[in-house]
Design a protein with these regions (language model features):
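Catalytic machinery of carbohydrate-active enzymes
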Residues: 1-259
Length: 259
């Protein structure tokens, strides 16, 4: 391996960058790399990601205009998680599995959130078939009443029963909210990956259709709030059987007509 290791992140989300955040340390500790650089071809949805994830990483030496390989995949092998797969794809292997993302930052605590349940309804990347109604029903079943909710943005699943709205002003502020809450509940998106990087277990909600490779952290409790019931499974199988039988019937009739 070259003594310079370059990282490029093509997808600009918070979680997308954190999926690569363990690589600089591994490259220097286990990969025999002298210098780690972040490609300027990387995409950022927010400038805070570059500053807090990469510029604050002690194993990152700077930035470069050079390109670097970027993995494309929709699943990971058993016994590994998403971060392991990226590590191995990039030619590194420290022998460990189920890596957690890294953030070299210690957030300040917010006293008013101590002992509170905080719900973040926002997401950018796909979280599966999930809507506000599914969250409300799940909270009602589990007798969960959030004390605070983050202010809803463009995409999300807000609930009606909440206390004061919190509007995060920066990535550091968001980290402080996660670190200060007694219980943090979010969707299985960037917030869950950020919490893993902070070493904080959360309840991460998702729905059918989300790729399970995004359930990457052993710290978290990943909850499907819109599970397919046994009746729905049976109905789906019955529909498929009926469609197959219909196609066979049409084929049989066509054969008779063509004789």
């Amino acid at each position: 391996m070259s003594d310079t290791f370059i990282i490029k992140i093509l997808h600009g989300g918070l979680g997308d960058h954190l999926f690569f955040s363990h690589l600089p340390g591994i490259a220097k500790k286990s990969g025999g790399v002298r210098q780690v650089l972040i490609s300027n071809l990387s995409v950022y949805r927010h400038p805070d990601y570059r500053r807090l994830i990469w510029e604050a990483n002690p194993y990152v030496d700077g930035f470069t205009d050079e390109d670097a390989p970027f993995p494309g995949f929709s699943s990971v092998p058993k016994g590994t998680n998403l971060l392991d797969y990226i590590m191995i794809f990039r030619g590194l292997d420290d022998g460990k599995r189920f890596h957690e993302p890294e953030l070299h930052f210690k957030p300040e605590r917010i006293d008013s959130l101590a002992g509170a349940t905080v719900y973040d309804p926002n997401y950018v990347s796909d979280v599966g078939n999930l809507e506000s109604e599914h969250i409300k029903r799940y909270f009602a079943r589990k007798k969960i009443m959030p004390d605070f909710m983050l202010k809803p943005r463009g995409k999300g699943a807000p609930v009606e029963r909440y206390g004061t709205l919190i509007e995060t002003k920066s990535l550091e502020h968001y980290c402080s909210v996660i670190a200060s809450a007694r219980r943090f509940i979010c969707l299985t998106s960037g917030g869950a990956t950020l919490a893993a990087a902070l070493g904080i277990p959360v309840m991460a909600l998702w729905g059918p259709g989300q790729l399970t490779m995004f359930h990457h952290s052993h710290l978290h409790n990943y909850v499907n709030v819109n599970p397919i019931t046994l009746r729905q499974r049976c109905q789906t199988k019955l529909n498929r059987y009926s469609q197959a039988l219909h196609r066979r019937s049409i084929g049989f009739v066509n054969k008779l007509l063509n004789k």
